[in-house]
Amino acid sequence: MNSQKQILNQEVIDAVAEKQQEVFDIKFQNIIYYMENKSKIIYQEKSVPIDFLKATSEMNSLDWTDKYNHIGFDNLSKTGECVQFIRQGEDKWYAEVPILKNGRWTRYTWISYSDTKTVTNMLRLFFEEVPWFGMLSWKMRRFKH
C-alpha cells in the first residue's frame, strides 16, 4: 500500500513539475509592458518586465469605462515586436501593432477587434515567441497626427 502511495505521489509531483516547466518556458521572456488604467500608470520608458500570467492579470483589470485604458507589450529580445490593446467592453478588445521602419514608427498600424479569449490566445503566442499575427483579422490604418 505504501509503495502505491509513493508511486501516486511521484506521478503527481511529476505532473506538477511538468506544468511548472510549461509556465516557466513562456514566463521569463525579455518582454516589458506599459499601461494606463484609472489610477495606475506604467510608462514605456520604465521598461518594466512582465510575464504572461501577470500580463493576463493586468489585462483583466483594465476598466473599459475609462476612455484612456490601454496596455502594451514590447519584446526586447528576439522578435522586437510590439502589440497594444484597448479594452472596449467586458469581452471586446481593440488591438494594434505599430508598423516600424528602422526602429521608428511609420504612422501606420495593423488594427483588429476581437474577444477576450482570442486576444489571450494571441498574447500567449506572443510571449512564446512563435507566430501570433495570424490569430486576428488585421486591417492597416494610417494615423495623420
PLM regions with names:
Residues 3-52, 62-68, 76-82, 86-145:
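Acidic, proline/glycine-rich low-complexity IDRs
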